[in-house]
Swiss-Prot record:
InterPro entries: L-lactate/malate_DH, Lactate/malate_DH_C, Lactate/malate_DH_N, Lactate_DH/Glyco_Ohase_4_C, Malate_DH_type3, NAD(P)-bd_dom_sf
Residues forming the catalytic site: H176 (proton acceptor)
An annotated Gene Ontology molecular function: L-malate dehydrogenase (NAD+) activity
Gene: mdh
Binding site for substrate: R83, R89, N121, R152
Chain's role: Catalyzes the reversible oxidation of malate to oxaloacetate.
Cellular component, GO, one term: cytoplasm
Organism of provenance: Geobacter sulfurreducens (strain ATCC 51573 / DSM 12127 / PCA)
Keyword vocabulary terms for this entry: NAD, Oxidoreductase, Tricarboxylic acid cycle
Ligand binding (NAD(+)): G10, G11, G12, Q13, I14, G15, D34, N96, I119, S120, N121
Protein name, UniProt field: Malate dehydrogenase
GO BP annotations, alphabetical order: carboxylic acid metabolic process; tricarboxylic acid cycle
Reactions catalysed: (S)-malate + NAD(+) = oxaloacetate + NADH + H(+)
Amino acid sequence: MARKKIALIGGGQIGGVLAQLCALRELGDVVLFDIVEGLPQGKCLDIAEASPVDGFDVCLKGTNSYEDIAGADVVIVTAGLPRKPGMSRDDLIEVNSKIMTSVAEGIKQYAPNSFVIVISNPLDAMVTLCQKVTGFPYNRVIGQAGVLDSARFATFIAWELGVSVKDVTAMTLGGHGDDMVPLVRYASVKGIPVMELLERKYGSKEKAKEVMDAMVNRTRLAGGEVVALLKTGSAFYSPASSAIAMAESILKDQKRVLPTCAYLQGEFGVNGYYVGVPCVLGEKGIENIIEFSLDAEEQAMMDKSVAAVKSLVDSLK
């Protein structure tokens, strides 16, 4: 049986980590594409030379030609300029739109049967543009944001409560921006509501809410926190890990429920836009969008987040 093939578009920080993670997990053979000559070739050579030490056995190829992505099962797109301190994700839209259009044309021509996972920012606009240019079915073009945002939320909860991140369940909805919706009511530790644990820790609902509000705010601004510390770019380890979780669920038909930037056609009251919602990811890409009830406060936050997404995406038209 032929090995799976993963194409990574963009040989920067995220692309390099993606290539390494694909190799370490032996998800399939890897093609790393970048327009800069030598960059993807050098990174793939470096990773390949670690294979005897780490014990993985896959083929890694760096390239400057889209022809080499032919036959890819999954394409992960990271190409685009990263954020610098003081920039929002939305500030990148003009330059990254041009890059995404070129990338999507390459994918359409050489990997017409692939599943596409977009990481490039501003995410909600870039995944919309990628689908539009490729013309691929909506279930085959998705965006990575919610897995990362949810992981950040879970991390902060685990730190606050002094528990393993493995036992924290947390999820965000909406756009990948400052108006994202971390779902406090559904956050839990081994099924125990986080708010109840915070109330027990601090002895009052008021203090528990104050602490949770701080974690929600930190989650919304977490990407900018990393950008401010790095000063030269944006996060790359956690976005790569998040995209790999999505790719693995598709390649192995795991049917994991993962927050995914998906095209909505009436779900959650949204029609015709890519928005972050929980989805079942399997061999058909998005196999199911999971809807559930939001209370009035959650719905208001979701409406605000969706409005921000619409404003951003409509600026492309």
